Amino acid sequence: MDRKLYISDVTLRDGSHAIRHQYSIDNVQQIARALDSAKVDSIEVAHGDGLQGSSFNYGFGAHSDLEWIEAVADVVGHAQIATLLLPGIGTIHDLKAAYQAGARIVRVATHCTEADISKQHIEYARELGMDTVGFLMMSHMTTPENLAVEAKKMESYGATCIYVVDSGGAMNMNDVRARFRALKAVLKPETKTGMHAHHNLSLGVANSLVAVEEGCDRIDASLAGMGAGAGNAPLEVFIAAAERAGWHHGTDLYTLMDAADDIVRPLQDRPVRVDRETLALGYAGVYSSFLRHSEVAAKKYGLKAVDILVELGKRRMVGGQEDMIVDVALDLKRAAGV
């Protein structure tokens, strides 16, 4: 494969979920220096739920998005800074502030069937001159054909790259292959595509490899898999696999391995791994960032987190409905007569 893969690190955004958005300034700078030294192409920085995600509903961050972005901008020289914006949480005002703080890439994220709400934010990002990405979350919840229709909308608004986003870590390799083929069939040849995997079924790396085989240009991954649920595709593992496949990725594997084990893993207050609870996310097709919220609710109401997560899956809850976790817990408690 002659083309160079674009390596997009998400340790400092999706990884924030794993520690309830409590990265210190020193943490983000240490991680960013290592990633920059390893020559990743971009480093995504924000609260786990994107710009202005710090809230009662999603969890308050140790710092503001702008403080984190500015801290990373101070220490990187190679990588571009990316950020995430969910329309309805972040605004174009927040996007402008992030740009002024140093972000040059924005991923505008919507549920996989709601691309139409991204129009204003994508258009404004293009006006700012940002690398503008459409990010279709929970991509397993619609058909490949419907996903392609939504991707085409984002492209029409000005997005120059569209992501298949397996927020629930629920897809297998055939699911990924079908979605990339559907996107490639309708998008312009010059429009890039990306893959954002979660590891809840231990398929994060495999799904990312299949995406590349189907022509995917950008791969999201994180050091030690640091991310919501069982984490994202572990960056160092994906790079090792890409290296063995003979693919051009441009990063230093050993620097990434050291950063994963020496810097990132020690920060985890709950191991980022496939276990009973995180497996339930992938099995039930639940938004990965529901994990920590569900564990808190389970402890509070004397329930099993797995039962809450499976019920959330049955109800087809999506990102942004974190407030329903307590409702589900109370329903389960009532049904059990406890």
Curated annotation (Swiss-Prot):
The record marks R13 as: Transition state stabilizer. Its EC number is 4.1.3.39. GO terms for molecular function: 2-isopropylmalate synthase activity; 4-hydroxy-2-oxovalerate aldolase activity; manganese ion binding. It is an enzyme of class 4 (lyase). Pfam families: DmpG_comm, HMGL-like. It comes from Paraburkholderia xenovorans (strain LB400). Mn(2+) binds at D14, H196, H198. It catalyses: (S)-4-hydroxy-2-oxopentanoate = acetaldehyde + pyruvate. Keywords: Aromatic hydrocarbons catabolism, Lyase, Manganese, Metal-binding. Belongs to the 4-hydroxy-2-oxovalerate aldolase family. Residues 5-257 form the Pyruvate carboxyltransferase domain. The active site is at H17. One of its GO terms (biological process) is catabolic process. Substrate binds at R13, D14, S167, H196, Y287. This is 4-hydroxy-2-oxovalerate aldolase 3.
